[in-house]
């Protein structure tokens, strides 16, 4: 019989307005499977489902559940669910976020949102009542973060330190594209390589793509190309640690030529090769080259 191996379970809770949404976004970046406001009665079933190999959800090793006062009567069953997990010896961690009353009041006024427990628009009364209701749960917390003086970046750093691996890794996605089809919407950095020699104007090379050796050799034969790709890779090696320090988890680098068929494809591949082996994960995708592989499209 396969050994039961339960996922790492983190329950994120705390005062409304204290930063639970930002904390959960960080946990998602760290690879956690996140569920918002799951009824407590379903927690044991979810943990059991994920803890047995061969069932749905296999491969999920880290789970974060957001539980807060918005759950109403559901939230009152959380204590029973935790006691059930304790009885089975299933480990879990509780991350409790809080902030000073005056800070929470200010945040609610800035966002113009209504506190879930406020009556007649009295924000402070709602905060005090919520703090009272959560007092026992706070006492069970594994980790408590006071966000009163924290910026979103600082909160992300604390959550990453608590629940991330010992060494955070940035995902670098390199995408080739053609300007005639538009710049990728999710690009963080865009590099225009239309200044490089264009294989399109060599009739023998026109039918091929940047994946083909003949096009690659033509593009890389230019001293300007070789100097450019080395300097661009060096720039990224300089930038990436600073992006990581700022809390960024995914960097999209888009490299564009006219049609996304020749130059951008070759250079995206070359850049991926130069960045492999560094302390970050690198993927290379070619958005528009498929247009030229089967349809015979020409610019």
Swiss-Prot record:
List residues binding ATP.
Answer: 14-21
Q: Binding residues for GTP, per the UniProt record?
A: 68-71
Annotated keywords:
ATP-binding, GTP-binding, Nucleotide-binding
Q: Which domain of life is it from?
A: Bacteria
Q: Which Pfam families match?
A: PapZ_C, RapZ-like_N
Which NCBIfam families does the UniProt record give?
Answer: PRK05416.1
Job of this protein: Displays ATPase and GTPase activities.
Q: Which family does it belong to?
A: Belongs to the RapZ-like family.
The identity of this protein, by name, is Nucleotide-binding protein Moth_0258
